[in-house]
């Protein structure tokens, strides 16, 4: 298990959890999102490869259409 900060809130996740796993957990995997991992914007092609560890800070911004 690992504790991360997700959008400013502490969350406990399983070990070997990728950014893609996190997006799936919150039903955001098929949404348009921007991910910041420890202050660095992560390219969508790396969501599956980037694994989270204890004390990581993740910010997820998802886009909502409107007018």
Regions found by a protein language model. Name each.
Residues 1-9:
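Eukaryote-biased recognition of intrinsically disordered, low-complexity regulatory segments
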Residues 37-38:
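Cytosolic Rossmann-like ligand/nucleotide-binding regulatory domains
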Residues 42-47:
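Short alpha-helix capping/helix-loop boundary micro-motifs
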Residues 55-58:
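Loop/turn positions that initiate beta-strands
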